[in-house]
Design a protein with these regions (language model features):
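A generic fold-level signal
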Residues: 4, 26, 42, 81-83, ...
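C-terminal closing repeat unit and adjoining cap/tail of repeat-based domains
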Residues: 227-250, 255-272
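Structural motif
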Residues: 38-40, 81-87, 128-132, 173-177, ...
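A generic tandem-repeat structural signature
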Residues: 56-102
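Beta-strand C-termini and the immediately following turn/loop, strongest in propeller blades
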Residues: 26, 30-37, 72-79, 118-126, ...
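Conserved beta-propeller blade repeats
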Residues: 16-32, 56-71, 102-117, 149-167, ...
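Multi-bladed beta-propeller domains
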Residues: 2-18, 42-57, 89-104, 136-151, ...
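Short, flexible, glycine-rich and Lys/Arg-enriched loop motifs at helix boundaries
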Residues: 53-57, 78, 213-227, 248-253
Length: 274
């Protein structure tokens, strides 16, 4: 589905399977999503599977490189408990390269300069498991923790690469925040009475779309599937927030940035009970 700022909802495809988290390709106009583990690309009714090699259990946290010649995915394994690690591979197929040996790691952003990835990670600190925003060189290396306190998720870069948008419970409810790329100067951008997740900045840097769960339906640190939720839009300075629509969805609806290149539309997924 796609939603325009003017309020028009257009259904572009219906599936008899669960699809999640579309990315909108600038170069081909395809929508890239995960379904049942593999990654697919879709356009004009034609679906093709992307060759992700051994990464055949991808969750809904995947992004394209700035020039779209590569894709980074969060690949899950269950041999030693639940794990998720970030891999990069050529978009036209090839051997995946491990980027984050530590797990669980859930990818959300690729910097515009192509040098860095941002992700949410569960890590042990002082005998406590904390959930924070991290960055790591796209070539691999040492990860860097950017957030401290609260439950922090959904980090993605601003179009100019200077800032990172993320969501955090540090103010109580889950809200959309923004900070500098090095983690400094965090600022709360949404001020909703409900829980706000996954703020996605438009390519022109002017608008942010995000998903909202009712505070009575979930804990602030939860974002589950099969929920009644809403999509909201605000200006990039946090002003003029407004509800766009209600839908049945949640996890998988809009986990990663899905804006069209011209910033007029964004893609999302809603679900139906059979």
């Amino acid at each position: 589905m796609a939603f325009s700022e003017s309020g028009e909802i257009r259904t572009v495809a219906r599936f008899d399977k669960v699809v999640e988290a579309p990315n909108w390709m600038r170069t081909t106009g395809e929508l890239v999503y995960n379904s049942g583990g593999p990654i697919y690309a879709w356009k004009d009714g034609v679906e093709r599977r992307i060759d992700t090699g051994v990464c055949d259990c991808c969750n809904n946290d995947h992004v394209l490189s700035p020039n779209e010649d590569a894709i980074a995915v969060s690949h899950m394994t269950f041999d030693s408990g639940f794990t998720s690690r970030v891999y990069i591979m050529p978009f036209d197929g090839g051997e995946p390269r491990l980027v984050t040996p530590n797990s669980p790691s859930f990818l959300h952003g690729w910097s515009p300069d192509g040098k860095e990835l941002s992700y949410c990670a569960f890590r042990e600190h002082d005998s406590r498991r904390e959930v924070d925003v991290y960055t790591i060189p796209a070539t691999g290396g040492e990860e860097r923790r950017l957030t401290f306190g609260g439950f922090n998720d959904g980090p993605e870069y601003s179009p100019d690469g200077r800032q990172i948008w993320f969501n955090s419970t540090r103010s109580g409810l889950m809200q959309v925040w923004r900070m500098n790329r090095d983690g400094s100067d965090p600022v709360q951008m949404s001020r909703n009475d409900n829980n706000c997740w996954f703020g996605h900045i438009s390519p022109d840097g002017k608008k942010v779309v995000y998903i909202v769960y009712h505070r009575d339906h979930l804990m602030p640190n939860e974002h589950l599937p099969n929920m009644q939720c809403e999509l909201w839009l605000m200006d990039a300075d946090g002003n003029h927030p407004r509800r766009l629509c209600s839908l049945f969805g949640g996890q998988g609806t809009i986990n990663v940035n899905s804006w069209s290149p011209d910033s007029r539309l964004f893609a999302f997924v809603s679900y139906e009970w059979e």
